[in-house]
């Protein structure tokens, strides 16, 4: 991931992560209008930061729902002022990051701390140290540190993913796989997550490439994506019927 070339007339990139090993496109697995119209209905709010949150009611149970579409900046106390009470009174949490292309790695690791009660190794990375193909440093641990003020580590949580969960969102997924209260539901994530580096060629074109490589706690690289604990596909027919199969699976799991 994070490999592209930028010229004055075109940007070149590799988007093969959207195609599976059989040459088929991964399903979209996301429709925000279906979520707002059929699940949240009028019980949701979108913050200026772009965070959408609300409540989903099912069979007498109430679950908090949060959609986060990008890790461009840290959550503010104003965000938490409205979101924390919704999470606290809910019986469980659906944290949806489908179609999240990433953003700040620091923001991702900070937010992951909401789901841990103690400092936890969530993966490893190795830094590129030379020109050779295998010139990398020794593996260095990556940690998630628990949030003191906003901790949801005791809240049963479903993390929703699809193939368009990329970069920092992929790293966030890797982190939450280590949280005891979190289950990943949906499709395999899109991969990526390494720190992009830049270099200008003599002709002025810009090349972007990863400066490190990321691994999970089993020391398996995550550049090709992270498999969900519960794999679910939402079809076009599902969405046309006002149904999100991934949310439905998450609700079933929350009610167990």
Residue ranges: model-predicted function:
Residues 66, 95, 157, 176, ...:
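Terminal peptide-recognition signature
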Residues 67-71, 96-100, 125-128, 160-164, ...:
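Active-site-proximal beta-strand/loop segments in catalytic clefts of secreted hydrolases
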Residues 102-160, 194-200, 211-222, 227:
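Gly/Ser/Thr-rich loop/hinge elements
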Residues 228-256:
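Low-complexity, Gly/Ser/Thr/Pro-rich intrinsically disordered linker/tail segments
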Residues 156-178, 183-190:
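Extended C-terminal subregions enriched in glycine
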Residues 177, 186-202, 207-209, 228-232:
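C-terminal soluble interaction/assembly domains
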Residues 1-123, 156, 200:
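Flexible, low-complexity junctional segments that flank or bridge functional domains
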Residues 78, 82, 106-110, 167, ...:
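Extracytoplasmic/secreted proteins, especially bacterial periplasmic and envelope-associated proteins
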